[in-house]
Amino acid sequence: MRRRRKMEAGAAARAWSLLWLLLPLLGPVCASGPRTLVLLDNLNLRETHSLFFRSLKDRAFELTFKTADDPSLSLIKYGEFLYDNLIIFSPSVEDFGGNINVETISTFIDGGGSVLVAASSDIGDPLRELGSECGIEFDEEKTAVIDHHNYDVSDLGQHTLIVADPENLLKAPTIVGRSSLNPILFRGVGMVADPDNPLVLDILTGSSTSYSFFPDKPITQYPHAVGKNTLLIAGLQARNNARVVFSGSLDFFSDAFFNSAVQKAAPGSQRYSQTGNYELAVALSRWVFKEEGVLRVGPVSHHRVGETAPPNAYTVTDLVEYSIVIEQLSNGRWVPFDGDDIQLEFVRIDPFVRTFLKKKGGKYSVQFKLPDVYGVFQFKVDYNRLGYTHLHSSTQVSVRPLQHTQYERFIPSAYPYYASAFSMMLGLFIFSTVFLHMKEKEKSD
């Protein structure tokens, strides 16, 4: 028996020793960041776009670089996604390698994956089809966005090196960043949004003088995109909170554009020592890869005022208190969300109560009186704001009518009816008394 105990103790000690030896090896695996597949036209893009990729690595992203026609490409294996994010920096690809195609990427988006796409004037059919799936329509191949009033001084003469003003950005700090930006350099293909798709976001538009056409041909027909309808960068947040960003310019993410000075060719234009491309690219990547604008619901509670636990059923006209915790992802940590426009609805089929929630400490709460209607209701919070994930919380409760012992003996509002009833009784009594005791006069012959 002693020998067995010694053997078991020795085995346990060896197991603990082995575990401590494996911990350093397991640590990097557990601490790895979001798995991101990067598809490139050629691997040289790792050098020409190194600043953007370095910003992702500095945020602990695990990047896997492959050419877009690599025969070993795969997004899904045994029904599970191999990556959390997808970056497509291969605008000219005609066919993806391996088992990746537009349908696979659409399935990846439907599964909640995030996709960042950069196109150019040499755009292939796969990216065009992917854009159509997401409500974005690219212009024809070899076309470019042209602006004869807002081009850079270093433009070669076709006026396709566009200087986009920060005023043309979407007014959503969660998506484009909260700091003021310098003008943005853009050279690439134009896009237009599907007017029937309310999920498409016009992140960066062209100026009123921009249009999309072949830069080396005279204009013989109305351009595909004109003025503010010309999209330079567009986004999409699907109903399942999956996010996609389309940029019409691959050069937008390049080191050359990040470090370039920028100045409009118009006389008297201000010169900036650096573009705002880097700051905008980082902000877009943080949003599309769900580092910004991600909300979640924490504990939810409801009870009568003065109590702490929810009842089996509420009674009509009860005074209740509802509270909910809403958190936001910030720098990898969940912190309390700060908002002043969160509403609560008390819904049966239609809302009977709609009121704002007020922040108290780390939660949002409100007190209100239940309607004088019984049935099955829901406490519903449906928060859908630009740049944030769709937040939804519903809690079902029952509301019953008053019990017989809970009604008032006399209802003040019914006093007129009481008076009419008693007056009717009194009148009937007087009439009966008079009628019974009244003696008719005898008729004389």
From Swiss-Prot:
Annotated GO CC locations: oligosaccharyltransferase complex
Keyword Transport appears in the UniProt entry: no
Stretches of the chain found on the membrane's Lumenal side: 33-415
Cytoplasmic topological domain: 437-445
Places the protein is found: Endoplasmic reticulum; Endoplasmic reticulum membrane
Biological or metabolic pathway of the protein: Protein modification; protein glycosylation
Record flagged with keyword Transmembrane: yes
Topological relation to the membrane, as annotated: Single-pass type I membrane protein
Keywords: Endoplasmic reticulum, Membrane, Signal, Transmembrane, Transmembrane helix
Parts of the chain that traverse the membrane: 416-436
Function: Subunit of the oligosaccharyl transferase (OST) complex that catalyzes the initial transfer of a defined glycan (Glc(3)Man(9)GlcNAc(2) in eukaryotes) from the lipid carrier dolichol-pyrophosphate to an asparagine residue within an Asn-X-Ser/Thr consensus motif in nascent polypeptide chains, the first step in protein N-glycosylation. N-glycosylation occurs cotranslationally and the complex associates with the Sec61 complex at the channel-forming translocon complex that mediates protein translocation across the endoplasmic reticulum (ER). All subunits are required for a maximal enzyme activity.
Oligomeric and partner information: Component of the oligosaccharyltransferase (OST) complex. OST exists in two different complex forms which contain common core subunits RPN1, RPN2, OST48, OST4, DAD1 and TMEM258, either STT3A or STT3B as catalytic subunits, and form-specific accessory subunits. STT3A complex assembly occurs through the formation of 3 subcomplexes. Subcomplex 1 contains RPN1 and TMEM258, subcomplex 2 contains the STT3A-specific subunits STT3A, DC2/OSTC, and KCP2 as well as the core subunit OST4, and subcomplex 3 contains RPN2, DAD1, and OST48.
Family: Belongs to the DDOST 48 kDa subunit family.
The protein's name: Dolichyl-diphosphooligosaccharide--protein glycosyltransferase 48 kDa subunit
Annotated organism of origin: Canis lupus familiaris (Dog)
